[in-house]
């Protein structure tokens, strides 16, 4: 039986501490591969380079918002087609308020409040791929 590639999660976050913590969390989550991007531009490059299963996006990046990143992907016909079926999760420590609706309208599948604990992340990721 051929080896199957692990589902890839792209985590887009500009806070170095959060990046390090997420790397540690994914060491505890077998069955997943993690890739990191610190800016929207890095995320766009990563998405164009390799098939991704889930994109976790902080809403406040240094070069664009998470909403803008999602909209840019949707506006690029080739990239959007290549990413058909990818699950998008908006992440923020801010009170969601109207941002949840804006995230859904931009194409996000869900909105998770930070900080995210390990069981929440694990069950959320599994639910997305079921």
Region annotations inferred by a language model:
Residues 13:
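Conserved acidic carboxylate
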Residues 103-109:
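As written
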Residues 62, 96:
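The feature encodes the CheY-like receiver
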Residues 39, 65-71:
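Acidic catalytic/metal-coordinating carboxylates
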Residues 116-125:
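C-terminal output helix
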Residues 16-35:
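Two-component/phosphorelay signaling modules centered on CheY-like receiver
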Residues 36-54:
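Acidic, metal-coordinating helix/loop segments flanking the phosphotransfer/catalytic sites
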């Amino acid at each position: 039986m051929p080896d199957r590639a692990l589902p890839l999660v792209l985590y887009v976050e500009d806070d170095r501490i959060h990046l390090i913590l997420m790397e540690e969390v994914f060491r505890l989550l077998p069955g997943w591969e993690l890739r990191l991007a610190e800016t929207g531009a890095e995320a766009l490059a990563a998405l164009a380079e390799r098939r991704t299963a889930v994109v976790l996006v902080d809403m406040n990046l240094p070069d664009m918002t998470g909403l803008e990143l999602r909209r840019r992907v949707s506006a690029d016909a080739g990239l959007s087609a290549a990413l058909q079926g990818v699950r998008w999760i908006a992440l923020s420590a801010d009170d969601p308020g109207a941002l949840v609706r804006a995230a859904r309208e931009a194409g996000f599948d869900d909105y998770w409040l930070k900080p995210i604990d390990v069981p929440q992340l694990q069950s959320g990721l599994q639910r997305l791929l079921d």
